[in-house]
Regions:
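Walker A/P-loop
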Residues: 1-11
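Residue-level signature of catalytic and energy-coupling elements of molecular machines
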Residues: 19, 60, 107, 166, ...
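Hydrophobic/aliphatic anchor position in the core parallel beta-sheet
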Residues: 5, 43, 83-84
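Walker B catalytic acidic pair
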Residues: 47-48, 59
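Conserved alpha-helical scaffold flanking the Walker A/P-loop in AAA+ ATPase domains
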Residues: 25-45
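Canonical AAA+ ATPase core
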Residues: 26-31, 51-56, 64-156, 196-201
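C-terminal engagement/docking regions of AAA+ P-loop ATPases
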Residues: 175-254
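Conserved AAA+ ATPase small/helical "lid" subdomain
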Residues: 136-191
């Protein structure tokens, strides 16, 4: 993407200051100076984010929501655009613990890549036969282009009926008998933005119900907190969201 990038490996001893940075006294200047942390970049990769303590994870809350860092009472603005991508291990792996709901809600989408297919694995191996393919990578765009695309979202049209449909899908999670915690207003906003992005990818400047449906599970599944009865019934968040989509249809299909 042509962005400045930093990666931080989360472990049990990772400190909040590793993310936010810290101030230290400079004897030469006789003053305190701020030293950047991992979050001072345009693209932050938080690797194995669920292997660190809740205190360290909380250091990302302001970073992801406000795009600022506050250290010793002084606020530092992050460069634009700012994007945070994280990986996590399945719960049950050594040293893992669940992420707090407030942090999960700040991630716009959650994707599970899974294993590559046989064909993809062959392509991966063949690509490394003679040289490292990473050395051939070139930026596909620039930081300015990313900002322009983000700003273009505001011009994508969304009718009241489609907006109401998106909100109804989210509201249904709050009243579902198997859901303890449903989609928050932040989640609704993320669904609308992703639906607009889906429309742009498909060459349209307006959103249709299919755009909302295409991103609904990826945007909402990780935000749900299910009741114990859901596991007893053999249902996960994706199944519940699919049931909601089956029950609530767009206005034109009613």
């Amino acid at each position: 993407l042509g962005l400045s990038c930093k990666r931080i490996q989360f472990t049990t001893d990772t400190l909040p200051s590793d993310i936010t940075g810290f101030t230290m006294f400079n004897r030469e200047t006789n003053s305190f100076e701020y030293r950047d942390g991992a979050a001072n970049c345009q693209l932050l990769l938080a690797d194995e984010i669920n292997r660190t303590s809740p205190k360290t994870q909380s250091a990302l809350l302001e970073v992801m929501e406000e795009h600022t860092i506050t250290v010793d009472g002084k606020t530092h603005h992050l460069p634009s655009p700012f994007i945070c991508i994280a990986t996590q291990n399945p719960l049950g792996f050594a040293g893992t613990q669940p992420l707090p709901e407030s942090q999960l809600d700040r991630f716009m989408v959650c994707l599970s890549i899974g294993y590559p297919t046989l064909e993809h694995q062959m392509n991966i191996i063949n690509a490394q036969r003679y040289q490292n393919p990473l050395q051939e990578l070139q930026p596909a765009t620039t930081a300015q282009n990313v900002i322009e695309v983000q700003n273009y979202l505001t011009s994508v049209q969304m009718t009241e009926d489609v907006l109401r449909y998106a909100i109804l899908l989210c509201e249904a999670t709050r009243n579902h008998p198997l859901v303890e915690l449903g989609i928050s207003p932040r989640g609704v906003s993320a669904l609308v933005k992703m639906a607009k992005a889906s429309a742009i990818i498909r060459g349209r400047n307006y959103v249709i119900p299919e755009d909302v449906q295409n991103v609904y599970t990826d945007v909402c599944a990780h935000r749900l907190v299910l009741r114990p009865q859901a596991q007893a019934d053999g249902k996960d968040a994706g199944m519940i969201l699919q049931e909601i989509m089956d029950d609530i249809r767009p206005k034109a299909e009613r």
